[in-house]
């Protein structure tokens, strides 16, 4: 499961690429059963889609899909941040600082998949601090639907440096109970991400069109 997941996140398996059980089983040196189970898990994460009579393929995302997801996510992030500003404990605030520093440390290592995971871990603490399990679940589901593109988003050094600053500013705003400032930082964070991912989607679409013309 993790091997296939990492291959999708790193872009080794491209959006729209068919995932053949037999070929993957041979490639990984396993039977078809664990491959089939991995497909189901990846489908739940939004990384794989099952097409009738065609089988599994790496999920693609359109600009409309992305905008729909982010429209809902921005609204729910605002709720989570408002609640976190009011309810966050000293222990959670401490973990948030540690997570922000861990992101900065991982940035220096250059592992983009690991960097995306540390970014997720940072935001997960904020969701937990909101003390609403259902809200946490929905936000995690929305985040997973665009997870693959986060690695593309993190490829630019300028973006990585910006995120380090945004994380630190967000921790300070939540610590101070400054809801408006925290929500502003979160919105800018997601809007920058949206623009970067749309650039990636357009490049992918252009590549598909060029391939059709060949």
Predicted regions and their residues:
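Hydrophobic residues in alpha-helical segments
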Residues: 8, 84, 107, 130, ...
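Hydrophobic, amphipathic alpha-helical faces that serve as interaction scaffolds
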Residues: 72-88, 118-158, 193-197
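Hydrophobic, well-structured mid-protein blocks that either form specific transmembrane helices
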Residues: 79, 85-103
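Short linear motifs at protein or domain termini
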Residues: 1-82, 86, 124, 198-214
């Amino acid at each position: 499961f993790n091997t296939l997941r990492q291959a999708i996140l790193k872009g080794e398996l491209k959006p729209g690429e068919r995932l053949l059980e037999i070929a993957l089983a041979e490639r990984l040196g396993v039977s078809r059963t664990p491959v089939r189970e991995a497909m189901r898990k990846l489908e739940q994460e939004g990384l794989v889609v099952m097409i009738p009579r065609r089988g599994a393929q790496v999920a693609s995302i359109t600009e409309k899909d992305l905008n729909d997801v982010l429209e809902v996510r921005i609204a729910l992030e605002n709720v989570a941040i408002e609640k976190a500003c009011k309810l966050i404990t000293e222990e959670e605030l401490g973990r948030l600082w540690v997570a922000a520093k861990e992101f900065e440390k991982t940035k220096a290592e250059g592992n983009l998949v690991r960097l995306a995971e540390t970014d997720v871990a940072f935001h997960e603490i904020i969701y937990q601090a909101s003390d609403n399990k259902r809200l946490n679940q929905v936000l995690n589901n929305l985040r997973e639907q665009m997870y693959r593109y986060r690695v593309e988003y993190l490829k630019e050094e300028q973006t990585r440096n910006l995120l380090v600053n945004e994380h630190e500013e967000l921790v300070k705003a939540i610590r101070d109970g400054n809801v408006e400032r925290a929500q502003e930082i979160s919105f800018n964070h997601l809007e920058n991400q949206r623009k970067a991912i749309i650039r990636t989607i357009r490049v992918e679409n252009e590549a598909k069109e060029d391939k059709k013309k060949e």
